[in-house]
Amino acid sequence: MKSAIAGAVLALTTSASAIAADRPVPPDPTLEFVFEEEVALSAGVAVGTTPYGGRSIAPIAGGTFKGPEISGTVLPGGWDWQLLRADGCLDLKADYFIKTDDGVTINVVNTAVACRTPDGKPGPVRTHAVFEAPNGKYDWMNRQTFIGSLVPGDEKVQSVRIRFYRVK
């Protein structure tokens, strides 16, 4: 019985190795800088404790963005949804609009998880952004994968600074 099981395991692992060896290895992704934005936030609204954690929301008050091929303003009126989880991490989901200098309005939905490092310091915050652009000059944004890096923004106003990168 033991030899039958050992034989079956050996056959499965040998087959899996042979199959894996025949397949091409996916290329490592690279990043291309797209733009940096400074997003101003209004005073947050505490929703309270929910079954998922401590919920709050912060209205997006506006801002600016600039990159090599795209720049403009962050429109007021969006929201940054925040959930403080039981493990101390913060789930973030921002939904807002940007308007390019040439008049195109683009929806941004940006999500992240912000956690502290084991020594209690703020850890790096990486985001995943989805853009919804109208057909035309910026519709390439609808077909790409984007990640971002988020840090606190200008100390004079409550804001965050995010650098967006296209994954290639």
What are these regions, as identified by a protein language model?
Residues 1-4:
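Positively charged n-region of N-terminal signal peptides that target proteins for export
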Residues 6-15:
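Bacterial N-terminal signal peptides
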